[in-house]
Amino acid sequence: MIHITLPDGSQRAFPGPVTVAEVAASIGPGLAKAALAGKIGDQLLDTSHRITADCRLSIITDKDDAGLELIRHSTAHLLAYAVKELFPEAQVTIGPVIDNGFYYDFAYQRPFTPDDLVAMEKRMAELAAKDEPVLRRVLPRDAAIAYFKGLGEHYKAEIIAGIPGDEEVSLYREGSFEDLCRGPHVPSTGKLKFFKLMKVAGAYWRGDHRNQMLQRVYGTAWASKEALQQYLTMLEEAEKRDHRKLGRELDLFHIDEHSPGTVFWHPKGWTLWQEVEQYMRRVYRDNGYQEVKGPQILDQGLWEKTGHWDKYRENMFVTESEKRDYALKPMNCPGHIIIFKQGIKSYRDLPLRFGEFGQCHRNEPSGGLHGIMRVRAFTQDDGHIFCTAQQIQSEILAFTALVQKVYRDFGFTDIIYKLATRPEKHIGTEESWDQAEHALAQGLRASGCEFEYLPGEGAFYGPKVEYTLKDALGRQWQCGTIQVDPNMPERLDAEFVGEDGARHRPIMLHRAIVGSLERFIGILLEQHAGALPAWLAPVQLALLNITEAQSDYCREIAAKMQKALSHLGLRLLLDLRNEKITYKIREHSMQKLPYILVAGDKERAAGAVAVRARGHGDLGVMSVDAFIERIADEISTKA
């Protein structure tokens, strides 16, 4: 007898080997129809998998995250099936699952067109409607290589050639199409109903620019028609909020071919950048951080000691001077340790908190660059806390409270907390890992935060907490982090004198709140659809006259406001152009200014202004003093 234990603790007995599908059918016809896969331990299995021993089994459906990932993976194969039917000369390569969908790379003699995508999607729907079974078989490695070479699928043969010779290779067939894959897959193509192909882009084979350029077809797939439509609607809204589009429309920045992956900030954009930086500088000052500044270029020897030269060199910009090799820093941590090492440090100095707005450079592939979100030169709100193991928990508690306040001020209230724990290959004792992971968890619990564990996703030298924002469209952005690191202080020989008079290694906590300022500003623009709150807006209000007769009055009002709000650095635009008032109002409204003030003869006589507030329309006539009070409160409270 084989005993299967289900998630609710109940057991089912079978006289001999049984498939996942048969177990699902024994529970009920509804589950049998909905079953996409099974899960034993951490392993996902096809519904055709034969169970030969007692186990705990979960049936995976499209209600599970794993089920949705399975749908997307299988839809990628369905795309390849359709492409091979439409374009038999195309060669298939790889087709993984990505956030919200999948892609598949093809080698073909000409670029795919938008009409080709329409044809592919139509053929996919036809193949799905046939509800063909998805069947698995296993071949010896060399037989699999010969099989795919015989089909003319040389990329697949190359992939398999990289697998050890004594291993078997699994293949999945649906109809006339068979592909290399570890699996699992949905039991039949009829499970794949709600998908859409999104775009085609270029991608080098194996990500190497020296190899052939392939065509990458992107798609999305969901468990229901409603979920697919909701996602497509979100994409439409995201397109309207695209920070690259807003950067042009609001005259904030641009990216130029003369310096790929770096930002040309325009006056208004640089004002926004400085406002974010100055806010974070006040955060440093008010929370016990000492601001420091390290050099841009550091010697190769230092990067060899930290391990970056071996593991990260391809992503570093390297230069040479007087027969010495240097690299532009991709991160600030080594510089902070060098500063820490100047002079003897005592346990009384700890925790010691350094912060830096350090400009970093990373040689990102050109295909991965994206506006100001993914760049090669960026400024990091980088901080490092030197402390003892016993101080980790209190530092996590303080840092989490700080993260929450900063995100709230910028308009984010939904934060997801994740704790990444030790990977299988790690350094340090199990006791030190237990202590660090416990300190992070207790710090989060003391902050009142619900969090999820990310088993095995910590760095090889220490665990970390990730702080992920959820924006107005429900998208997630991982910005904040705090990482426990006993390794780099060891590598660079950082020490402090303990209470016992002996020398000890400090623990280093790498921490960032907004991360890259450039990326965070991109997130801010998309969160607020360009309509930044008054305290952040590059221009907070425009003051307009109706005719020349009110010009002097507008100048007087502007001077009064600037004087009254000098402590807040009011950013006011005085527009006295001889244009129709409707034209001027429309122009400034398109720039998403928080306030537009208009002064005509009536307002001048009353010593007042007509106020228009973004999102609220005409607020009527208001005294100048009343408006000063209103905007001062809005800026100072970050409303």
UniProtKB/Swiss-Prot annotation:
| Record: residues binding Zn(2+) | C333, H384, H510
Q: Which InterPro entries match?
A: aa-tRNA-synt_IIb (IPR002314), aa-tRNA-synth_II (IPR006195), aa-tRNA-synth_II/BPL/LPL (IPR045864), Anticodon-bd (IPR004154), Anticodon-bd_dom_sf (IPR036621), Beta-grasp_dom_sf (IPR012675), TGS (IPR004095), TGS-like (IPR012676)
The record describes how the cofactor is bound as: Binds 1 zinc ion per subunit.
Needs which cofactor?
Zn(2+)
Q: Where in the cell is it found?
A: Cytoplasm
Could you state a single Gene Ontology molecular function term? metal ion binding
Q: Which UniProt keywords apply?
A: Aminoacyl-tRNA synthetase, ATP-binding, Cytoplasm, Ligase, Metal-binding, Nucleotide-binding, Protein biosynthesis, RNA-binding, tRNA-binding, Zinc
* GO cellular component term, pick one: cytosol
Where does this chain mainly localize? cytoplasm
Q: Where is the TGS domain?
A: 1-61
> How does it associate, per the subunit comment?
Homodimer.
- HAMAP family of this UniProt entry? Thr_tRNA_synth (MF_00184)
Protein family (similarity comment): Belongs to the class-II aminoacyl-tRNA synthetase family.
What is the official name of this protein in its record?
Threonine--tRNA ligase
- Give the source species: Verminephrobacter eiseniae (strain EF01-2)
Q: What is the lineage of its organism?
A: Bacteria, Pseudomonadati, Pseudomonadota, Betaproteobacteria, Burkholderiales
